[in-house]
């Protein structure tokens, strides 16, 4: 397939048009004619857990959840794992899920938080853990008895952890050994008296269970062993005593960053999640079947990874968990496991790409020259002709790279943040496979847009899946309208608004945000600004945000106003603007220093100070103070400023960086300092590799 071939994406639907004339659409999946009629339930009104139970029974002997067994430690005390994956079968996983559900049900009164919001009743527990077999077993066990899970993760920060616990009032939290220390610190620091029980994941996590349980008890928890207390036989409770989740049951409350700074609890139902599986099957956008293998390393606390695992289990495929971390074991794990589809984020691919090029450089001599000749030849062939294979170089050079991924990889699906085109191009060259880009958010059950498996262009995020329909609503204040013209062609732009079975059920106990999220026609306003490109098959590209918020390459949202309100308290800062985007791993700050305070602290004159905006002593002074403020404010690692750009001209009305009401015009600042930002970004990228 050549680059000139354009796959057709978003298609206009005539029926059910919302009111108003400032929108383009509705757009629907190109193979559909009528969204309302064709969004039918292929699963006969089943819940996700009902479907998964049927698959676990039908394919009981197939391998389901796998991990590499620990066989020892090296001289540094680091774990050594077997060179193979060992699996629990679908039948074994089903039995563990039922045991967990029964034992949780028996202790329901002491362990479960009972709550309600709107028309939903909740039985709540929390999960605070890394990816492991126990995570999936506990999650499905909860679904077997209509227990809703509230998910937490370490990068939330301590204040956000407290906020979620206060909002849900969870009595019980399931925790992996690596997070026990942080959990205990949070409980004691914030005096979370209602959080009284902790269940330790100790089946596959290679921990000293006795020691970690004692640590939990010292912090004031009633501590339980997942293995000893929740995987034991329970003859007191029958399967029929369990209240199996129905399609309308809220499966999970997934917390995501909010524009106010407080996390928002996104309520996702069983219907939402099975609609994702239904969409994948109906659209045939991803080559997913019972022969598939998935490596799980993206956090299960985020809905994307849960959606992926649900999809693989929904077709009775295999899932293997990462043994260590992305940096330490991911590549070795993949070479052993052999994933067929790789679900990842740009940041991980950037790390892998660096390892590949480092490997080229380490070859030296003629082998290094051969590797780079092969790379540049394939890249040029792709850009000119759309060809991603090479008869000679694929065997001589790139076969070794394919082996790094296990030799079975059919495609990579990159999500969470937009993927830079050059990154996608490199992996087409390395692996001779298509790169799919998915785009979604927690509120969309993790997925709403997807490029096609056969499309090699990777210019846009593709089109809507068959699980949503979309309108584009003009945002004239930001300069985006549905009448925009590029090169003589109408390319509508505006806020992306969506409707359909993938859309969430609202924010937990947050009436204000719920009132803002949906319009009178039932469309969810995403806050993302998108543009339709007719000459790329009506593909959609994210071009801006309606509100002042952005996402880093890890997929984490950053709220600049929240950070600026803290950092501006520094005596050494007169003005500050936090900047970042989805290709960056860290934020940077554009700062106008307070000349008087800085000069005094550095014992120089103001005239001397303003001569050098790159003064390392000045940068160190300001960075140290920002670090102090970040610690005091309990900012997480991604909210801490590690890179700064200094300017003494400041943001003014005259240079159009301030409005008459003294608000920073972020776009103008970005444009004004574009060259310096790009230079600093290049340094940041080099340092993070």
Where are these regions (language model features)?
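Conserved ATP-dependent adenylate/AMP-binding module captured primarily in the ANL superfamily
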Residues: 139, 156-188, 276-295, 326-340, ...
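Conserved ATP-binding/catalytic segment of the ANL
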Residues: 478-481, 487-552
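Conserved structural elements of the adenylate-forming
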Residues: 98-102, 266-287, 394, 399
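Conserved AMP-binding A3 loop
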Residues: 87-90, 251-277
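Structural core segment of the AMP-binding/adenylate-forming
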Residues: 2-18, 144-229, 623
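Conserved AMP-binding/adenylate-forming
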Residues: 69, 74, 79-92, 101-156, ...
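Conserved pre-ATP/AMP-binding loop-to-beta segment of ANL
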Residues: 63, 221-226, 231-255, 262, ...
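Gly/Ser/Thr-rich phosphate-binding loop
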Residues: 221-226, 340-343, 352-457, 469, ...
């Amino acid at each position: 397939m050549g680059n000139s071939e354009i796959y057709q994406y978003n298609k206009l639907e005539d029926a059910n048009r919302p009111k108003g004339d400032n929108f383009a659409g509705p757009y629907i999946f190109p193979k559909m004619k009528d969204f309302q009629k064709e969004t039918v339930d292929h699963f006969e009104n089943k819940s996700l857990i009902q479907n998964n139970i049927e698959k676990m029974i039908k394919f009981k002997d197939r391998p389901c959840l796998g991990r590499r067994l620990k066989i020892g430690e090296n001289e540094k005390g680091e774990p050594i794992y077997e060179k193979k994956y060992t699996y629990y079968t679908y039948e074994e996983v089903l039995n563990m899920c039922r045991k967990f559900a029964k034992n949780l049900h028996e202790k329901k009164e002491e362990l479960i938080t009972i709550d309600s919001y709107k028309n939903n009743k909740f039985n709540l527990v929390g999960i605070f853990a890394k990816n492991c077999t126990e995570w999936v077993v506990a999650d499905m066990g909860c679904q077997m008895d209509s227990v809703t899970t509230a998910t937490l993760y370490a990068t939330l920060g301590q204040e956000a952890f407290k906020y979620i616990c206060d909002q849900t009032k969870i009595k019980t939290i399931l925790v992996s050994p690596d997070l026990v220390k942080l959990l205990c610190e949070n409980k004691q620091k914030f005096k979370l008296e209602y959080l009284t029980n902790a269940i330790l994941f100790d089946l596959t996590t290679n921990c000293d269970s006795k020691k970690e349980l004692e640590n939990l008890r010292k912090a004031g928890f009633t501590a339980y062993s997942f293995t000893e207390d929740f995987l034991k036989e329970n003859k007191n409770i029958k399967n029929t005593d369990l209240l199996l989740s129905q399609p309308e049951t809220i499966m999970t409350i997934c917390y995501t960053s909010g524009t106010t700074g407080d996390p928002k609890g996104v309520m996702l139902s069983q219907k939402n999640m099975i609609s994702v599986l239904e969409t994948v099957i109906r659209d045939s956008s991803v080559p997913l079947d019972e022969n598939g293998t998935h490596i799980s390393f993206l956090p299960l606390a985020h809905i994307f990874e849960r959606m992926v695992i649900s999809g693989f289990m929904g077709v009775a495929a295999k899932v293997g968990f990462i043994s260590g971390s992305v940096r330490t074991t991911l590549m070795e794990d993949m070479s052993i496991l052999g994933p067929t589809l790789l679900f990842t984020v740009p940041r991980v691919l950037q790390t892998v790409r660096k390892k590949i090029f480092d490997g080229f450089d380490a070859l030296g001599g003629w082998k290094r020259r051969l590797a780079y000749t092969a790379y540049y030849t394939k890249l040029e062939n792709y850009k000119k002709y759309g060809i991603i294979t090479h008869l000679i170089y694929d065997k001589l050079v790139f076969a070794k790279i394919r082996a790094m991924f296990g030799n079975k990889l059919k495609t990579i699906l990159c999500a969470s943040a937009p993927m830079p085109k050059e990154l996608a191009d490199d992996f087409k060259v390395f692996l001779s496979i298509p790169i799919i880009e998915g785009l979604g958010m927690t509120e969309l059950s993790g997925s709403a847009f997807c490029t096609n498996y056969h499309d090699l262009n990777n210019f846009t995020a593709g089109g809507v899946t068959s699980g949503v329909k979309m309108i584009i609503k003009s945002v004239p204040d930001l300069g985006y309208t549905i009448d925009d013209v590029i090169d003589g062609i109408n390319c509508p732009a505006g806020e992306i608004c969506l409707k359909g079975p993938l859309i969430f059920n609202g924010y937990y106990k947050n009436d204000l945000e719920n009132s803002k999220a949906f319009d009178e026609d039932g469309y969810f306003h995403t806050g993302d600004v998108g543009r339709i490109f007719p000459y790329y098959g009506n593909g959609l590209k994210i071009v801006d945000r309606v509100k002042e918020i952005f996402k880093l390459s890890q997929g984490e949202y950053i709220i600049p106003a929240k950070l600026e309100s803290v950092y501006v308290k520094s005596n050494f800062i007169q003005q500050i603007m936090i900047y970042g985007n989805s290709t960056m791993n860290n934020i940077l700050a554009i700062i106008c220093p307070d000349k008087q305070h800085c000069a005094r602290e550095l014992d120089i004159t103001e005239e001397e100070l303003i001569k050098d905006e790159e003064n390392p002593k000045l940068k160190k002074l300001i960075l140290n103070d920002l670090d102090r403020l970040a610690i005091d404010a309990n900012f997480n690692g991604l909210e801490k400023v590690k890179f700064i750009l200094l300017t003494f001209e400041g943001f003014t009305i005259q240079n159009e960086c301030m409005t008459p009401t003294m608000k920073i015009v972020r776009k103008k600042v970005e444009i004004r300092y574009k060259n310096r930002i790009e230079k600093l970004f290049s340094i940041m990228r080099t340092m993070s590799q």
